[in-house]
Amino acid sequence: MIPIQLTVFFMIIYVLESLTIIVQSSLIVAVLGREWLQVRRLMPVDMILISLGISRFCLQWASMLNNFCSYFNLNYVLCNLTITWEFFNILTFWLNSLLTVFYCIKVSSFTHHIFLWLRWRILRLFPWILLGSLMITCVTIIPSAIGNYIQIQLLTMEHLPRNSTVTDKLEKFHQYQFQAHTVALVIPFILFLASTILLMASLTKQIQHHSTGHCNPSMKAHFTALRSLAVLFIVFTSYFLTILITIIGTLFDKRCWLWVWEAFVYAFILMHSTSLMLSSPTLKRILKGKC
């Protein structure tokens, strides 16, 4: 049990982190959305960032409501909010992975014919790939939706005589829900890892190829990109691991350590959100023009 003062402190930290992420997401959507209306077209990276901004905006509000309902034991409301949080969480993972895939195919210097064909196809069909990630999320959330319905049934049966066989089956399916959610996050994370490793290998190769004993502008750009990619890799991997531990949820007394853990988790998410804002040339150009 931690002191109430410490609980309130971490609760405030979590709320401030959440509000900052919401403001960042709103800014991304507003700035890039306005650019979209003005020029009638956006680069694929900006399409992903707008989608990520919308997804993370909804995810953060769902997270705040979900955590407060969990803390105050509003179980029936919590079941309905959990499915919303899971949907936008999975969608956010897929969009982050697609962003890394885009950078990989755009920046990498691989010349294999299969890679060149993939680059042409992916860039050509990018809006459909975004739609596909939404459809995949809808499909992968089905076990969680069924699991939430089962959770509501279990809550309803708490004060009634139980059929142990039925209850055991319901609880086993509820455990399967968490396994399905974990798999739904692992697949885009593996895609992220593969794209990141390929991109880092390509950038390292380009740096070695252009190395002439002094730092020319091309090498500086490659070093900057490699450093940014390493930071993104560390932050996103930490984000994945903390979310995975949150889903498993067996390491902590949720009510006691909820706000400490959430403040820790969303510190990584805030860093990741900030790094995404800095990854868009369009966004940086517009914001610099406003200053």
Swiss-Prot record:
InterPro entries: TAS2R (IPR007960). GO terms for cellular component: membrane; plasma membrane. It comes from the Eukaryota. The chain crosses the membrane at residues 2-22, 42-62, 85-105, 126-146, 183-203, 229-249, 258-278. One of its GO terms (biological process) is detection of chemical stimulus involved in sensory perception of bitter taste. The keyword Membrane applies. Residues 23-41, 106-125, 204-228, 279-291 are cytoplasmic. It is a multi-pass membrane protein. Residues 1, 63-84, 147-182, 250-257 are extracellular. One of its GO terms (molecular function) is G protein-coupled receptor activity. It is found in: Cell membrane. Pfam families: TAS2R. The keyword Oxidoreductase does not apply. Glycans are attached at N80, N163. Keywords: Cell membrane, G-protein coupled receptor, Glycoprotein, Membrane, Receptor, Sensory transduction, Taste, Transducer, Transmembrane, Transmembrane helix. Receptor that may play a role in the perception of bitterness and is gustducin-linked. May play a role in sensing the chemical composition of the gastrointestinal content. The activity of this receptor may stimulate alpha gustducin, mediate PLC-beta-2 activation and lead to the gating of TRPM5. Interacts with RTP3 and RTP4. Belongs to the G-protein coupled receptor T2R family. Most taste cells may be activated by a limited number of bitter compounds; individual taste cells can discriminate among bitter stimuli. This is Taste receptor type 2 member 16. It comes from Pan troglodytes. The lineage of its organism: Eukaryota, Metazoa, Chordata, Craniata, Vertebrata. The gene is TAS2R16.
